Amino acid sequence: MTMLATKKDPMIVSMGPQHPSMHGVLRLIVTSDGENVIDCEPILGYLHRGMEKIAENRTIIQYLPYVTRWDYLATMFTEAITVNAPEKLANIQIPKRASYIRIIMLELSRIASHLLWLGPFMADVGAQTPFFYIFREREMIYDLFEAATGMRMMHNYFRIGGVAVDFPYGWVDKCLDFCDYFLPKVDEYEQLITNNPIFLKRVEGVGFIGREEAINWGLSGPMLRASGVRWDLRKVDHYECYDELDWQIQWQKEGDSLARYLVRIGEMRESVRIIQQALKVIPGGPYENLEARRLNQQKDSEWNDFDYQFISKKSSPTFKLPKQEHYVRIEAPKGELGIFLIGDDNVSPWRWKIRPPGFINLQILPQLVKGMKLADIMTILGSIDIIMGEVDR
């Protein structure tokens, strides 16, 4: 009996782009042989809005509302790096109380970001229940944000030299109540998820990244710490007042999707510890360095000249960036968020280069999915934790 020779061509599957509220406008062109992935090519740029060029035509305060649109699930971090860069460039000191307020807000934002990673990630691997649980806790964090800043998501709260407003009356007690409520909920998540045999089969050994490989690819955040590298910029760069608080770097050595899940679960616990300590030792005093608003220049006499006498509204003085360059970075929920800033003694930056963690971490995706099954693509992509707003900028 003669067998018919069949020719097998690889199949090309286009995954995405999805809506920004789902997995984001990332398109993957996947080449597969049946269920096995041969190649994967990410197509970026669907959410590119020219954020770096916008910065060059705005003052820092004018630019602050724009930066919350990079990583729109952890907006406190994009605001923090936007004011940290000019502060470091001009050597502006911030009050101790403002630094503690920043730490509390940043760690709340870190928890909210990890929660909204956990829910969709679990839905991707087939567990729907945690998706509904995480929104319950995340809503409480957003209530705290709304009480302190007036906005649930795009806060516009950080300022050069401090923060916009102090905590309202009773906010500290509400935040402590949330911490006491949230810690048992993290234990509940772990009981529900970590030892689940179906979950373990979907994530254990999937998307493995070795220690040297993670360093060579320039990975950061939970992606790096899950591969056995104890690297956290809060410990390395000693910014704000993190050194005055007792907390540990969360890391794992396995390097797979399960390790990245465990790192983020551990980080939520550590963030609660940081918030509880900061709320108990937060000092009094001003919440903003008002001296940062002053200008080191003489009174400009040309405004009194004949040519300007009919101008009804003269431009108000604003913060000028010194003629220097500087790179500033912070530990965002997804990794190292950095700004390379060049000032030229003007109110607007000459160059504003954004180093987003998601963009760098995403580059390793094609290598991770080669040789895996099609169903593993969503598991690996979910474990990287990307937001296309900061990837495309």
Swiss-Prot record:
Q: List its EC numbers.
A: 7.1.1.-
Record has Aminoacyl-tRNA synthetase as a keyword: no
Catalysed reactions, as listed in the record? a plastoquinone + NADH + (n+1) H(+)(in) = a plastoquinol + NAD(+) + n H(+)(out); a plastoquinone + NADPH + (n+1) H(+)(in) = a plastoquinol + NADP(+) + n H(+)(out)
Q: What class of enzyme is it?
A: translocase
Q: Where in the cell is it found?
A: Plastid, Chloroplast thylakoid membrane
Quaternary assembly: NDH is composed of at least 16 different subunits, 5 of which are encoded in the nucleus.
What is this protein for, i.e. what is its function? NDH shuttles electrons from NAD(P)H:plastoquinone, via FMN and iron-sulfur (Fe-S) centers, to quinones in the photosynthetic chain and possibly in a chloroplast respiratory chain. The immediate electron acceptor for the enzyme in this species is believed to be plastoquinone. Couples the redox reaction to proton translocation, and thus conserves the redox energy in a proton gradient.
Q: What is this protein called in UniProt? A: NAD(P)H-quinone oxidoreductase subunit H, chloroplastic
